[in-house]
Structures are given as C-alpha cells and as structure tokens.
C-alpha cells in the first residue's frame, strides 16, 4: 500500500507541475482547422474573400476584384492623434483611417507600486503594434483606395466625458466624390465597449456600394500583462465565435502555417453575428457585429509580420440622395465574465479555465459570493477552503480512519516483515490478509489527494485567469494574490504543514519508501515557490484543516480502541 501511495503522490505532483508549465498550450481546445476557401464560397451578400494585399494597405482587406478607385496622390500617415477620455478608457484615434492606435485603462495600473501609470492595451509605436481598425471597403469604400486610407477631420483634438455626463459622442468627418462620411465613436460612463458607427450620406448621382470591416492587428511581441515565471504564460492569440463552436481559438502558429504555405487561402469562417477577439492575460479586445448579420471572419498574417483577426460585413448599397448607417461594438477591457456574457453569447468563454472549467466556474462563483460578504480575496480563499473541506469531510474522515488503523497495525506489519524477510510475494499476500482482517482499505489514504487535485488545478486557473485576482491584496506582505510570494514565506509554511501532516501518518515499513516520503515536503515546497500566493494560501489552509481533522479522528479512534481493549 505504501509504495502505491508514494508513487501516486509523486505522479500527481509531477503531473500537476507539468500541467502548470504547459498551460499556454491550450488544454482541451482544438485548434481552428485551416480552410481553403475560394471566393465563390463567401456567404450571400458578402464581398469576396481577400485574395491579396497591396503595398500601401497590406493590413486592410481588399475589395472585390472588379473594384476601381479614383486616382489620388498618396498621403503620409497622421501624427496628430485625437484624444478621447472617459472614466474607464483613455484612447487615441488616428485621423488617417480612424483607427484606435492607443488605449489605456485608468482603473488598472500597469504595476501595483505605480498606480498612477495605467495599463496600456493598444499601442502603435516603434516597440509594439496592437490596434483596432475599422473602415469601409468595396466598390466605393474610401478605405479600399490604393492611394491610402481617408483622413478624417474632427472639431477638436481632445474629448473628455464631463462630470454628470453619461455618454460621449465623437464624430470624425470625411467627404469624397459627393459622399459624406461620419465615423462616430460612442462611449458610455463605466463601460469598456465602444460603438463605432459609419453614417453615409450619398449626395452624388451614383449609387454607393461598400461594406464595413473591423479587425484587430497585433505583432508577435510578448504579453505585457502576463508573468512567464515557470512557464505560466496564459493564451496569447485570437479567438472567434461560430454557430457550431462558441469559442474557437486561432493561434499565431495557425496563421504562420497559412502564411508559409502560399497555396493556402487565409483562414475564414462564414458566421451570423458572433464576434472576433484577441486574448491576453486578464484582458480581451473584441469586435462584435450586429446580431443576425452575415459576416465573413478572416484570420491571417500580413507581410509585416502582424497577426490579424477580423470580419467583413454584408455589402450595402446607398441610392443617390439616400442615407445609411452601419456599426459594430468594440470591447477593450478586463475579462469580466458578467459583462462579456451580456455583450455577446460565448464571449465570456474568453476567460479560459481550461478543461476543468466545469469545476473552475463554480469555484469562481463561490469566491465571488464570499468576497461580496468579506471584501477581501485572501479571506475569500480561506473561507472557500473551509467550505470545500467541509464538503469532503466524510471522505477525509474515512481516509483518516484508514490511516489510524494502519498506525494501529504497524507492529503487526513489522512482525510480518521480520517473519518473511525478502520474500516480497509472501509478504504482500500476508499484508493483504491482515488488511482484510482488520477492515483496512490500503488505498484509503489516497482518496483525499485524488479528490483535491482537480480542485487544486481548477483554483490555480481561477487565480491565473480571473482579472478580479489581479493585484488583489491579502494582508501583511501578500500584496498580490495572483503572483508568487515575494519572500517565499507561504511556500515554506506549506512545506512545514506537510511535514507535520506526515508525522501523523503511519511510517512506511520499507526504509526507502520512508526516505521518499520524507522528501515530499521539500519537493512540494520547491514546486510551490513560484505559484500564485493565493494558491499556496489555499494549500496551507487546506493542510492546517487536514492536520486538525486527522489529529481529532486519530485520537478518537485510539481512545475507542483502548476502551474496547479494557
């Protein structure tokens, strides 16, 4: 029994550690299959799938092959960004194309020790490229011009949501060939979603035809919001919604494969409504088209090495003298499950808890409700641990009773070892007969470990993925439960509790097994050195409760045994 238990503990420890190291390899999620989609397979009313790129606008989807654009001189990129601020967003819009080139989150500091510096989500500088693009393409779309994208004008260079104001509307204007365009940004107090609308006023004598596109463009730079200590980087890449799969990932490697094989068309999906998103640690950006709209999703890598996930909406025609409007929602902010679920079905799945999501979701739900009462995530973890321990108490009690009986028959086991010596077969047979006679389950001590491991791994992913845990303080030196203990005090305490718990267990009869078991607290302490402090806190509290339970049950059984003997 002891060697089996030792092997089980070591195996689970190794498996747990490896799973943590491999988190960023997308557990349980199938990669988006590459599809060779010809232009004839596009959904009804959609422009043809992009089949190439131009030197001027490599990052913009191409219009249909018969598109022509009026000749005009190339224009230089604009350097004067339009600043827009609300209580939760601080963004900068490039007048050329109206792209959101910079976006900061004032309520989420870059670092805990510098709360005045907000986390920057979008950036289109020399060191990093990450921005949200949208425009109008098609036969008459201004963003389809080979000469360059339109340069919008604005009444001011800076806009800010005033006190007492719940909504901020910013209009960018552009006119060409008798058609007036307004690109409108609508932002609301307390919300991270931005409505991007196009108002088209056709004052020309010809029908206007085009379609809206929206995309997220990012380079291959690392995730600034993620910690890579011991390889615990979360998923950095694209994702989308389809009717058959509400959460489908498209990794950078997927786009690389298509880019390397020129015979393959870009990765495309025809969807109705849905969303496209770019994921990183704690934060997500997503374009959400109108519900019921037929769209073509495109994922690709451009010639500059940037990765793009976006969609093209249905083609629309505006008659001479008529007006039209099309829009989409851009979300750029924290992975708040409740908010994301309200925006679009399946978007909340970007909070990726891995293949144990069915355990992680209830754990997070419990944590949230406990936190609403105690107001501290550290204490929430402690009370959650107590609750879990209470739920599994019957199982733990049975296990501890089994171990107490094992301790009671330890002299008999020693006598069997002395009797049979090196004859392992007879020794094992005699041990099993003894266990049967004493009504001992030789695997009973393993059950709590087996039960705890899924909960342990699920809680790890909850702490890793939930933005609510980001920079969440506990007490004393623990100022952030989502990162490692800066002084490694909690892991050392955890190792000490494991050692104490080990003393309550029966000593393995084999000397080699005993040595291995003595090493387990040291091994686990090393594993936990770089784990999130919240996870180590859970394990420390769990061990302390286990020690109390085991001591109580063992003493109770020993007292009953002495009473029966008397």
Curated annotation (Swiss-Prot):
Instruction: Give a GO cellular-component term.
Output: plasma membrane
> What highest taxon heads this organism's lineage?
Bacteria
Q: Where is this region: Disordered?
A: 38-72
Look up and give the membrane topology term: Multi-pass membrane protein
Q: Which residues cross the membrane?
A: 7-27, 347-367, 373-393, 443-463, 474-494, 521-541
Q: Which CDD domains does this one have?
A: 5TM_YidC_Alb3, EcYidC-like_peri
List, alphabetically, the Pfam families matched: 60KD_IMP, YidC_periplas
Alphabetical keyword list:
Cell inner membrane, Cell membrane, Chaperone, Membrane, Protein transport, Transmembrane, Transmembrane helix, Transport
Q: Does the keyword Protein transport apply?
A: yes
Query: Which terms under GO biological process does the entry name?
Result: protein insertion into membrane; protein transport
Q: Where found? A: Cell inner membrane
User: Under the GO molecular function aspect, what terms does this record hold?
Assistant: membrane insertase activity
Q: What is its main location?
A: membrane
User: What role is this protein assigned?
Assistant: Required for the insertion and/or proper folding and/or complex formation of integral membrane proteins into the membrane. Involved in integration of membrane proteins that insert both dependently and independently of the Sec translocase complex, as well as at least some lipoproteins. Aids folding of multispanning membrane proteins.
Self-association and partners: Interacts with the Sec translocase complex via SecD. Specifically interacts with transmembrane segments of nascent integral membrane proteins during membrane integration.
Family in the record? Belongs to the OXA1/ALB3/YidC family. Type 1 subfamily.
Cross-referenced NCBIfam families, in alphabetical order? PRK01318.1-3 (NF002352), PRK01318.1-4 (NF002353), yidC_nterm (TIGR03593), yidC_oxa1_cterm (TIGR03592)
The cross-references to HAMAP family, in alphabetical order and at most eight, read: YidC_type1 (MF_01810)
Q: What is this protein called?
A: Membrane protein insertase YidC
What organism is the protein native to? Pseudomonas fluorescens (strain ATCC BAA-477 / NRRL B-23932 / Pf-5)
The major lineage groups are:
Bacteria, Pseudomonadati, Pseudomonadota, Gammaproteobacteria, Pseudomonadales
